[in-house]
Amino acid sequence: MNHGIRGAEADRDERFVKELCGRMGVPLTVVHEKVGSYAADHGLSTEEAGRILRYRHLKETAEKYGCAKIAVAHHEDDDAETVLLNLFRGSGLPGLSGIRPVRAEIIRPLLCVSRKEIEEYLTSREHSWCEDSTNKENDYTRNKIRNELLPWVTENINSRAAEHILAVSEFAA
């Protein structure tokens, strides 16, 4: 889904995905949304509006192709960020359980793999990938956790901090 937020960068990412799917013979459905307008019209954050629209389109596409499951690419680091975000927001035990590997038709097969491992795998096979530049901006609390807090904790306290955070989240599940 092209969120209508990142302009030329998003268009470049869309072309990349179209070319990759074409080379691999994978069917592709592309939709364009104006996430900012949807967020404003519905009183939502841009993040929440994007999530709602993304999952809506994923479900519609799965139905169109007769797919029972939708695999998304959340990984171990996303899960650790979610646990910390929920902890800091005071969500209690349910929030500490993190991202569920299976929720209805959504499956998350990469939750046991770190972002670093994914990047190393792609690099070892000489595959390129796209990165959303907004993930590096610290405009959102999640990004501050991703870009500042977790790297600091990993460097200064424990290099396996994400694993330990997720081990605690297992008890809350």
What do the predicted segments below correspond to?
Residues 1-150:
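Core alpha/beta nucleotide-donor-binding catalytic domains of modification enzymes
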Residues 140-173:
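ATP/NTP-dependent adenylation/nucleotidyl-transfer catalytic domains that generate, transfer
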